[in-house]
Regions:
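Feature recognizes metal-dependent phosphohydrolase scaffolds
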Residues: 1-241
């Protein structure tokens, strides 16, 4: 999705949350998105959360409900909270629950209730499937893993391709390790290899920089490479249990 409208006063990117509602609420409060009572207060702000709100942590259903509430509240303050598709959302859509914690299941009530809630036509199944894979604001493209040159295209085209793949009517390879939900090379490969590929991808997308989650930064600090053309923002502040 491409952001339409005037440029907001603030653009904030947030990495992986992994069903850790307490850490998420503390972060939102710390950066001035919500007040002490948990109510949205930020005006004229766009927040892009780069995916992986599910799995690992204890607060699966509560996290989804809270984020949806904040999306609605943000709109009342001329703000926008964009949640992107992460590889863990994709896994849940496809029934891969390897990283679902027992407490996550309990948050839905039971295993069967979680399965029912995430069915393709159920409330949370529909919500997860509706998440965009990319968002572009001016010269910055946001995505969970990274967009390789092979899949580099305008934001709307990538979003459409991933949506079709989840429906089983498109190229399912886009959901694999080289696709935008899983790709890690820009933060892991030597810069001599990664940066030329990144430059090519950005040219095809029509952007100057890419902001990604997914690849953990154990230093707890945002990682910048390729002269500021890539930022890795998964600083592991949320649950990895």
């Amino acid at each position: 999705m491409a952001f339409a409208g005037n440029v907001p006063d603030r653009i904030i990117a947030i990495g992986d949350l992994h069903a850790d509602l307490k850490a998420t609420q503390e972060l939102f409060s710390h950066i001035g998105l919500i007040n002490a009572d948990g109510a949205w207060i930020a005006k004229d702000t766009v927040v892009v959360q780069t995916g992986d709100v599910t799995d690992r942590g204890p607060d699966g259903k509560n996290m989804l409900e809270w984020l949806q509430q904040q999306q609605l509240a943000a709109q009342q303050h001329s703000s926008k909270l964009i949640i992107l598709m992460g590889n863990h959302e994709s896994m849940n859509i496809r029934g891969d629950w390897r990283y679902v914690s027992p407490k996550d299941i309990q948050s839905f009530g039971s295993l069967n209730e979680r399965k029912a809630a995430l069915q393709p036509q159920a409330e949370w199944g529909l919500w997860l499937a509706s998440l965009p894979t990319t968002a572009q604001i001016q010269d910055t493209i946001f995505v969970h893993g990274g967009i390789s040159p092979h899949y580099a295209a305008p934001s709307s085209s990538i979003n459409d391709s991933v949506r079709k793949a989840h429906l089983g009517v498109g190229d399912r390879n886009i959901l694999g390790s080289d696709g935008p939900l899983w790709y890690r090379d820009y933060l892991r490969a030597p810069e001599s290899d990664a940066c030329p590929k990144l430059k090519l991808a950005l040219e095809r997308i029509g952007a100057k920089r890419m902001v990604v989650g997914h690849t953990t930064q154990r230093s707890g600090r945002i990682k910048m490479r390729c002269d500021g053309a890539i930022f890795g923002i998964d600083t592991v502040f949320a649950s990895k249990a």
